[in-house]
Amino acid sequence: HMKKMGMEFNLECPVQAVEASPVGAKVVCKNKAGETVSFEAEKVLVAIGRKANTASLNLEAAGLNNDRGRIIVNDKMETNVPGVYAIGDCVFGKAQLAHTASAMGEVAAENIMGIPAVYDEKTNPTCVYMEPEAASVGLTEEQCKAKGIDYKVGKFPLVANGKSLIINGGEGLVKIIADAKYEEVLGMHIIGPRATDLIAEGALALRLEA
């Protein structure tokens, strides 16, 4: 969809520098082949996530293991210091999303109260609020291959869905990844209208091991 709009995608292309140019700005990158390439544009949007707001906490003095200020926790949201828990954007290696922090908070609170609970990352969806919307939960094909999982894929084009056509949103698809033998849902990926709402069904299927 975005390629049709004239957008160009360059993945695995780390930025080396951003410089002023007659057009506006020039971004210098290194591509997968190790070659230096550059792109010019009027504006550059930098979207690299948030920096953990932990500088004032003196993590080292508290003995908390961290990676550049992001606190390392286990699946119970507990740090290496017994009784100390961390959740949200200050946690290392987790998605910086509000619903992710909420799920972490529930797990931490239950463990603090003595109720065993673990954070299940695979049932926590990721949503991209754009046009068209995109959403994902569970494993991708690449992750299944890396884990050696025998899987199968089902795809449904939204152009075949009446409700999508009614709202002029026929462009998009739903992709489901399932275990090849037992047909348990391993992942769901959607692009199209209301994808960020529909992904909840995929998260439910994963949580119920359907």
Q: Language-model segments: which ranges?
A:
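A conserved FAD-binding loop/helix module that cradles the flavin
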Residues: 1, 87-145
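Short, acidic, Ser/Thr-enriched surface-loop or helix-capping motifs
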Residues: 31, 74-75, 179-180
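Flexible, glycine-rich terminal cap/loop adjacent to redox cofactors
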Residues: 113, 130-210
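A conserved short coil-to-beta-strand element within the FAD-binding core of flavoproteins
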Residues: 11-23
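FAD-site-proximal beta/loop scaffold in flavoenzymes
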Residues: 9, 38-113
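A short alpha-helix-loop-beta-strand transition element characteristic
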Residues: 65-68, 115-125, 149-154
